[in-house]
Amino acid sequence: MEYKEIIAEVPNLFQVIPLTVFRKTEGVVFDLVNMDHLPKIDGIDRVIHDENALSPGSIGEVKRPWYMHPHQEDNLLVLNGTRHVDLYTPEHGKIESFEISPHKIKRNGELIYDGGVVLSTSVNVFHRIRTGSKGSASLNFAVRHPKFDMKTNFNIYKLDTNTDQYEVIRKGFKDQN
């Protein structure tokens, strides 16, 4: 099977990896993930959002905080609904916004691929999600690096994209069971 190349990429920020349609029949789409782009998976996270969910949610006066994983890469596959994903690093200097559904992805409002994708993000990327009006479901294929710590991996940050100043406003482990 021949796999398609990466659709879009900003080094040390993101890659958009297309799924390959293996089979389409009436009412069924069967896609394959190119495992060359995911040679190692340390965790698989199932994440289900209700309609219009924010992740992370508001904390105090910070209405749209951010996550940032210092020792984990994320590989997001949206299975149902729509996710609006913002990404930012001080090195890149601007927010990249994606709208991802099971069958297409837009970058900064422009359709970049008509088909299923994995949105892969590097370590140290600030990210946040807003779910569409019908809710959403996804899988994340996590790649964990040395020094990964579940207690700090989901810390929530206040980030000023004008000055690149950031601070932890909630310790991630406080939301874990």
Language-model segments: which ranges?
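Active-site region of the double-stranded beta-helix
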Residues: M1-Y113, S133-A137, A142-N177
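Histidine-centered metal-chelating micro-motifs
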Residues: G116-I129
